């Protein structure tokens, strides 16, 4: 099985910027950790795929967080990624599932809802943040990220996202693409791109056929039209730690920590993103109080 990775490329003489990713293993890791049911897995996996490709557009230590909140039964989907291909995600209600929709596909729109927004916060370093948001227009997510780029970042784009789930709830395949029109692109190039996208198979079909990220871009943009610039491995990775949660407990204040010691004789923290649990003993909390004096 091919490991997850993202490719970045140019097409049509540099007038098109393109990203594609296979994210099957990363989405599987998230599914296992959160025990998501199929519709939730598809929604979470599509969001992870978009987020990890958006991360590939960053540099150095920059990172971003994407929050999808369509006010649907799944609640919020939160994913973050960095420039190194690390991605993690969780959903408020992982056991969300519905019968297949009219097209015989997982009903992601029903789970996500259509009465909310996508918010993107980019940490670009030096305590500098870029924040953008756009309304959810479809709930299927690919169209919603396309709309986000057009309205919030003024970049005409096409975003395709697909997740296939096996009958046993495991992830069969996951992946997607982001194709963007660069400033100065000719009308001819834009027309060619629109035609190519209108004629392409759904992303889920491309990944089901076992296409690589390079194969996805070649399939959409045509063999020989794509110049691959680089590739980055992608993986589910959580940077939580015992120390980070201890700092978070410190932020609750002395009164709350005294209460933890007196009533609970310790504390437990659970990471939303990966499900890891961290235990803090009475003595550890008492030591923490000492450092706060």
Swiss-Prot record:
HAMAP family recorded: HslO
GO BP terms in the entry: protein refolding
Name assigned to this protein: 33 kDa chaperonin
Single Gene Ontology MF annotation: protein folding chaperone
Superkingdom assignment: Bacteria
UniProt xrefs under SUPFAM superfamilies: Hsp33 domain, HSP33 redox switch-like
Keywords per UniProt: Chaperone, Cytoplasm, Disulfide bond, Redox-active center, Zinc
PANTHER family per record: 33 KDA CHAPERONIN
S-S pairs: 238-240, 271-274
Localization of this protein: Cytoplasm
Purpose of the protein: Redox regulated molecular chaperone. Protects both thermally unfolding and oxidatively damaged proteins from irreversible aggregation. Plays an important role in the bacterial defense system toward oxidative stress.
Main localization (coarse): cytoplasm
Xref: Gene3D superfamilies: Hsp33 domain, HSP33 redox switch-like
A Pfam family reported for this protein in Swiss-Prot or TrEMBL: HSP33
One of the record's GO cellular component terms: cytoplasm
Family recorded in the similarity comment: Belongs to the HSP33 family.
Post-translational modification: Under oxidizing conditions two disulfide bonds are formed involving the reactive cysteines. Under reducing conditions zinc is bound to the reactive cysteines and the protein is inactive.
